[in-house]
Structure formats: C-alpha cells, structure tokens
A protein has these predicted regions:
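Serine-hydrolase catalytic machinery in alpha/beta-hydrolase-like enzymes
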Residues: 25, 29-37, 43-145, 243-257
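Short alpha-helix in the alpha/beta-hydrolase fold that links the catalytic acid
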Residues: 86, 210-221
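Acidic catalytic loop of the alpha/beta-hydrolase fold
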Residues: 205-209, 238-239
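C-terminal catalytic histidine-bearing segment of alpha/beta-hydrolase fold enzymes
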Residues: 224-279
Length: 279
C-alpha cells in the first residue's frame, strides 16, 4: 500500500522577428503592442547531445525589438497542445516562448503508466534534466528576436519540479515559476549557487504537497538566502491550471481538477513576477 501511495503521489506531481532592431541594447524594455499581436508559430528541431528534440516556439511579429524568452517545461504528458497554448499566451504578452521537448522526438504519453516511465528518469537525474533545459535555453538564444540576457522558465507539475531543480543547481535563468510542481525534488540548494528568482504557485488543496513539505522547502531556500515567493490558491488541487485536468482525473482516477479562479490568479502572479525579474 505504501508503494502504491508513493507511486500515485509521484504520478500526480508529474501529471496532471527577423527584422529586429539591432540597435536595441539587451535588457532594454520590450515595446509591446497587445492590441494587435501577430503570433508566429514555429515547430523547431534542436539537440541535447545525441538526442533530437522537437520544440515549439511562438512570438509576436508585430513587436520590432528583442524581447525576453520564457521556456515552458510541460507536465509529464509531454509536448501536448497545452504547453503550446501557454507559449501562444506568453507571446501575446510580448515574450518569445518555447515549449520544451524533454522526452525527445516530441513524445507524448497517453496514460499515467507511460508518462511515469518517461518522467521518472529525469526526476532521478536532476543534473541531466538541468542540461536538457540548458539545451533549450541555448537554442532560444539563437533566435534573432531573443534578448539573450533575459531568459526565464516556467513548468507545470513534472515541469515545475524540473525548473525548481534547475534553479537550485544554478542554471543561468533570471527566474523560474513552478505551477503545482512537487517540492521534494531531491536537490539541496547551495549558497551562492541558487540565484534565479523563484515563484511557486501551489494549490492549497493539493493533497500531494503537505504542510511539512512546504515548510522544508521554504527552510531550504531561506538557509541559502535564495529569492523566492510562495503563493497558495484556495480550493485548488493538483494540476489546477490545466482545463483538461478534471477530465483526466476522472479518466485515470487521479485527484486532479481544473480551477479557473486559481488558473487566472496564478497567471497574473506570474505576469507580475516577470515584470519584476525580466527588465
């Protein structure tokens, strides 16, 4: 029974322009025209060592300056339509966004067992996961619209754990945002190494994030002086930001569900966070 509970807990954590103004200095504020965005979408191929990866990029072509880049690490289901939708939403906000392919060749898991098989090796090898994320960062920096000094990452469930671990391990990111990600990532932050600003968006009703885990997470970051903000959303379970969570929860008997209020609030918190850390 203990093994089953731990497996279910792990499952829920993983579930659920080319004509840019070259005179603009990196780090200078992006000029955004939200009234008339022209979103360009690109399916891209990049590599991490010998692995071929299939990412997805979106940005607003109506912006004529370089802009910050935000990487998106998906839930354990892989590169589904959900992280691509989030990339388009970030593009409308004036960023260039890239949905990251963690599993290789754009693989998607159709059921929890397959997703677990895909995700667990990365959870168990945080440095390899950091390298995977760094490969995506290196690729997005090569895009002509990217302000290479302003790179951040967000992650959902499994992806939330991955970006938190990358921040703890010292990835060169301005900030990371974890949406309903596991807090026990197996990485202990070190003083002077964890520099990225951190925002954690956690569902208050997430049965797999205990008060003890929250306290331990905060204590770890406080002990090394890491900059972080921890937000909780009332009545929000695991996977609260994904509109498909309720259906998947019923289909696979998982305690996950969509919460529109928490989704909206956490997205606004993310926007406010990036307005501060991406300048």
């Amino acid at each position: 029974m203990k093994t089953y509970v731990l497996m279910l807990a792990a499952a829920s954590f993983f579930a659920a322009c080319n004509n840019a103004d070259n005179t603009k200095k990196e780090g200078e504020a992006t000029k955004i025209n939200p009234a008339s965005p022209v979103i360009k979408e690109e399916s891209v191929v990049y590599t991490d060592g010998k692995d071929t990866l299939n990412g997805y990029i979106a940005y607003d072509e109506s912006i004529n300056t370089k802009r910050p880049a935000i990487l998106i690490v998906p839930e354990w289901w892989g590169l589904t339509q959900y992280p691509k939708m989030r990339a388009r939403e970030l593009a409308k906000l004036g960023y260039i966004a890239m949905a990251v392919d963690f599993y290789g060749k754009g693989k998607i898991a159709e059921d929890p067992q397959t997703a677990k098989e895909y995700a667990m090796p990365w959870y168990q090898a945080p440095k390899a996961a950091q390298q995977r994320l760094d490969a995506a960062a290196a690729f997005i920096k090569g895009n002509t619209v990217t302000d290479t000094a302003q790179i951040a990452a967000i992650g959902y469930c499994f992806g939330g754990s991955m970006v938190l671990n990358a921040a703890k391990l010292g990835s060169n990111l301005k900030g990371v945002v974890s949406f309903h990600g596991a807090l026990e990532g197996g990485v202990v932050p070190q003083k002077g190494l964890t520099k990225a600003n951190i925002l954690v968006c956690n569902g208050e009703a997430d049965s797999y994030v205990t008060p003890d885990q929250i306290a331990a997470f905060k204590k770890q970051l406080d002990s090394v002086g890491a900059p972080y903000t921890f937000k909780q959303y009332a009545d929000a379970t695991h996977a609260f930001s994904n509109p498909e969570a309720t259906e998947k929860g019923k289909k696979f008997n998982m305690p996950i569900s969509y919460n529109a209020a928490a989704d909206t609030a956490s997205w606004k918190d993310m926007q406010d966070f990036f307005k501060t850390v991406l300048k």
